[in-house]
Regions:
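Short, low-complexity Pro/Thr/Gly
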Residues: 1-195
Length: 195
């Protein structure tokens, strides 16, 4: 008979906030609070604003335009990240780029994971197909197996919250989780450069 020693534990998601104004073209920093012993899966939560026809009303009323044609880039959650890095005690330990995250996921993601991942990062027709200010039919693959919403006339992009999974070494396996309790004399920070 073999007895193995184990410890009960719980996993909880704890939201952390960035210092400074998180906006396009900015660098923000988050100091990880010591609410637990380990840091494991880490996600970036981004809220994309609504883009509607009222944003182009000044140009339209001045006779300079005919409405707002807008769309987010494909894979907006990955595209919004210029780079993200983990810093421990003032020393950069790991750095990743949004482009690298995109390539990595294209190479390693299974077809079963793809649909959920695309929804998390905003790669949906709701965000990536162009809006039509005249409410006319959106030019798209209406006769194919595309989702029905592609062909529905839209004049705005909705406000959407994205959840981008970060791929640091401690996010991949519970055995590699970052031991915050052992780093009590060092600050753990996540630095994010937004495109």
């Amino acid at each position: 008979v073999t007895y193995r020693r184990y410890t009960n534990f719980a996993i909880e998601s704890i939201e952390q906030t960035f210092n400074g104004q998180a906006d396009f073209g900015r660098r923000v920093q988050c100091t990880i609070s010591r609410n637990g012993d380990l840091a494991y899966r880490t996600y970036l939560q981004v809220t994309l604003p609504e883009i509607n026809q009222l944003m182009g009303i000044a140009a339209f009323s001045a006779g300079q335009g005919s409405g707002v044609y807008a769309r987010w880039l494909d894979f907006p959650g990955e595209q919004i990240i210029a780079q993200v890095e983990v810093e421990i005690g003032g020393q950069r330990i790991d750095r990743q780029y949004g482009d690298w995250m995109h390539i990595w996921n294209q190479l390693t993601m299974t077809s079963e994971q793809e649909r959920g991942y695309f929804k998390m990062i905003g790669n949906t027709t709701q965000l990536t197909f162009i809006t039509d200010p005249s409410f006319s039919e959106v030019d798209g693959p209406c006769d194919s197996l595309a989702p029905r919403q592609v062909c529905a006339p839209r004049n705005a992009l909705p406000e959407t919250t994205l959840y981008v999974p970060l791929q640091f070494w401690f996010c991949t396996n519970p055995g590699l989780a970052l031991p915050l309790i052992a780093l009590q004399y060092h600050e753990v920070k996540i630095n994010l450069d937004i495109r």
